[in-house]
Structure formats: structure tokens, C-alpha cells
From Swiss-Prot:
It is a peripheral membrane protein. Residues 1-27 are annotated as: Disordered. InterPro entries: RGS, RGS_sf, RGS_subdom1/3, RGS_subdomain_2. This is Regulator of G-protein signaling 1. PANTHER family: REGULATOR OF G PROTEIN SIGNALING, REGULATOR OF G-PROTEIN SIGNALING 1. Residues 72-187 form the RGS domain. Interacts with GNAI1 and GNAQ. One of its GO terms (biological process) is G protein-coupled receptor signaling pathway. GO terms for cellular component: cytoplasmic side of plasma membrane; cytosol. Its main location: membrane. Regulates G protein-coupled receptor signaling cascades, including signaling downstream of the N-formylpeptide chemoattractant receptors and leukotriene receptors. Inhibits B cell chemotaxis toward CXCL12. Inhibits signal transduction by increasing the GTPase activity of G protein alpha subunits, thereby driving them into their inactive GDP-bound form. It is found in: Cell membrane; Cytoplasm, Cytosol. Keywords: Cell membrane, Cytoplasm, GTPase activation, Membrane, Signal transduction inhibitor.
Length: 196
């Protein structure tokens, strides 16, 4: 059986689509696994950079401020940077819809009355409806109660569902967050930087 001969030089192949060969050779890049991991971690935790600004002031985020997050979920969520770091943690656990819903409810409470209906429907469709893409984990009664309340929306129509999600985060996600590498590495890095 005759063997097939392939030239070592792609240009010697006649009748082939040179653009396909060029694409394949251009896609080869040096392996930079370590750099990719660092880039991934930075995207997950952008707050590890030493120049991170605090949400309360123009000061750099301090280890004391981050340590206060361990006192309660309320203190963590009262801090913009805390919300961001906790949100990144929830993303790593595939449960970011909880904080997204909680933040949407907080924003909703500041809504002008003429915009309530539109905003309530958006939040309901995004998080509460049984077919929502980012459906939150609430019981049937709370889901039905919220559905009724948005028919005549008030600033408090999501309060019951928001409380359920807050309790879920407080009892489930928040304790794991405090033990996570995301939180502990951030705290350790800030403590190390303060000693310099």
C-alpha cells in the first residue's frame, strides 16, 4: 500500500487553502498557564491590588475595614467593596443571583413612584418568576405573595422575598465566605501591606 507523503513546509502543499494553514500556525502561542491563572484570579478578586480605594473614603482599603466584614453580613453589605468581593465569591459558587436580587431590591426602594411598576416587573421577571433566568431560591408562598404585590407595586413589595434571600445568604453563603480563600487572602494581603 503506497504511503502518503506530506511536505514539512506548508507552502509546498499545492491546492490547499493557505489561509487555513496560516490560521493554525497563528493560533499557537507559548504556554503561559501561570500567567493565565494570575489573570483569572485578578478578574475574580480585583480587590487584591494594594491601590484599592475604600468605599467610605478616599483612603486605601484597610485590613481593619475588611475585618469588620466578619462581624455581620449587614456590615459587609454596607460597604461597596464588601459587596463586590462577596459578589465575586457568590459567582464562584454559582449563586450570584442572591446578591444581585438583594442589590436590585435596595435600588428599588429608592425608586420614584412613577417608575415603580416598570422596575418591579423587571425585577420580578429577572429573579422571582418561576421561569426567571436568575431565579432566586424562595418558597412557593413568598413567590406567589410577591407576584400579587407587584400588580399594585409599592416600595415594599419585594421586602418579604428580600428578607428570605438575606437570611439564606446570612446562614449559608456568608459563613463560607469568611472561610474562603477570597476573603482570607484579601485580609492577609492587606495586613501584610500595613506592616510594610
Amino acid at each position: 500500500m503506497p504511503g502518503m507523503f506530506f511536505s514539512a513546509n506548508p507552502k509546498d502543499l499545492k491546492g490547499t487553502d493557505q489561509s487555513l494553514l496560516d490560521d493554525k500556525t497563528q493560533k499557537r502561542r507559548p504556554k503561559t498557564f501561570g500567567m493565565d491563572v494570575k489573570a483569572y484570579l485578578r478578574s475574580m478578586i480585583p480587590h487584591l491590588e494594594s491601590g484599592m480605594k475604600s468605599s467610605k473614603s478616599k483612603d486605601i482599603l484597610s485590613a481593619d475595614e475588611v475585618m469588620q466584614w466578619s462581624q455581620s453580613l449587614e456590615k459587609l453589605l454596607a460597604n461597596q467593596t464588601g459587596q463586590d468581593v462577596f459578589g465575586n465569591f457568590l459567582k464562584s459558587e454559582f449563586s450570584e443571583e442572591n446578591i444581585e436580587f438583594w442589590l436590585a431590591c435596595e435600588d428599588y426602594k429608592k425608586t420614584e413612584s412613577d417608575l415603580l411598576r416598570c422596575k418591579a416587573e423587571k425585577i420580578y421577571k429577572a429573579f422571582v418568576h418561576s421561569d426567571a433566568a436568575k431565579q432566586i431560591n424562595i418558597d412557593f408562598h413568598t413567590r406567589e405573595s410577591t407576584a400579587k404585590k407587584i400588580k399594585a407595586p409599592t416600595l415594599t413589595c419585594f421586602d418579604e422575598a428580600q428578607k428570605v434571600i438575606y437570611t439564606l445568604m446570612e446562614k449559608d453563603s456568608y459563613p463560607r465566605f469568611l472561610k474562603s480563600n477570597i476573603y482570607l487572602n484579601l485580609l492577609n494581603d492587606l495586613q501584610a501591606n500595613s506592616l510594610k
